[in-house]
Amino acid sequence: MAPKAADKKPASKAPATASKAPEKKDAGKKTAPSGDKKKRTKARKETYSSYIYKVLKQVHPDTGISNRAMSILNSFVNDIFERVATEASKLAAYNKKSTISSREIQTSVRLILPGELAKHAVSEGTKAVTKYSSSTK
């Protein structure tokens, strides 16, 4: 039996991945170890798509983004995070510390990002940490 037109959801402009929060990767496991044939759970991908989409709508409410562009931006964010984490890890090792603090993150951002971009990133990061600290008290 065909679904009625009233039962359908209206189409949205947001990409399918943008409506979901970053998802955790689940190793595909069977739900029952016995002989029952159960479907494996689908491995979930963690992405920054929903956050990128929210920022895009704050800056340009009438602009959309293609899945390919979203994938490129997601790769960019992952790459920058990996570079910052690697540099912060090296800084902690140089100083014979086993913990990465906000100071190592800040220094690694200054080393990785050029000039004015580093200054803005550090100020935004400081603002975010201050906001978080005040909200948890």
From Swiss-Prot:
Residue positions, PTM N6-acetyllysine: 8-9, 13, 24
Alphabetized UniProt keyword annotations: Acetylation, Chromosome, DNA-binding, Isopeptide bond, Nucleosome core, Nucleus, Phosphoprotein, Ubl conjugation
Linked residues for Glycyl lysine isopeptide (Lys-Gly) (interchain with G-Cter in ubiquitin): 131
Cross-referenced SUPFAM superfamilies: Histone-fold (SSF47113)
Molecular function per GO: DNA binding; protein heterodimerization activity; structural constituent of chromatin
Gene3D superfamilies according to UniProt: Histone, subunit A
Composition skew (Basic and acidic residues), residue ranges: 1-10
Post-translational modification: Monoubiquitinated by the UBC2-BRE1 complex to form H2BK123ub1. H2BK123ub1 gives a specific tag for epigenetic transcriptional activation and is also prerequisite for H3K4me and H3K79me formation. H2BK123ub1 also modulates the formation of double-strand breaks during meiosis and is a prerequisite for DNA-damage checkpoint activation.
Modified residue annotations for Phosphoserine: 12
Numbered residues of crosslink Glycyl lysine isopeptide (Lys-Gly) (interchain with G-Cter in SUMO): 8-9, 24-25
Gene Ontology CC: nucleosome; nucleus
Region ranges (Disordered): 1-45
Matching InterPro entries: Histone-fold (IPR009072), Histone_H2A/H2B/H3 (IPR007125), Histone_H2B (IPR000558), HISTONE_H2B_site (IPR055333)
PROSITE patterns: HISTONE_H2B
Organism domain of life: Eukaryota
Subcellular location: Nucleus; Chromosome
Family annotation (CDD domains): HFD_H2B
SS bonds (residue pairs): none
Functional description taken from the UniProt entry: Core component of nucleosome. Nucleosomes wrap and compact DNA into chromatin, limiting DNA accessibility to the cellular machineries which require DNA as a template. Histones thereby play a central role in transcription regulation, DNA repair, DNA replication and chromosomal stability. DNA accessibility is regulated via a complex set of post-translational modifications of histones, also called histone code, and nucleosome remodeling.
Family: Belongs to the histone H2B family.
Subunit structure and binding partners: The nucleosome is a histone octamer containing two molecules each of H2A, H2B, H3 and H4 assembled in one H3-H4 heterotetramer and two H2A-H2B heterodimers. The octamer wraps approximately 147 bp of DNA.
Protein name: Histone H2B
Species this protein is from: Chaetomium globosum (strain ATCC 6205 / CBS 148.51 / DSM 1962 / NBRC 6347 / NRRL 1970) (Soil fungus)
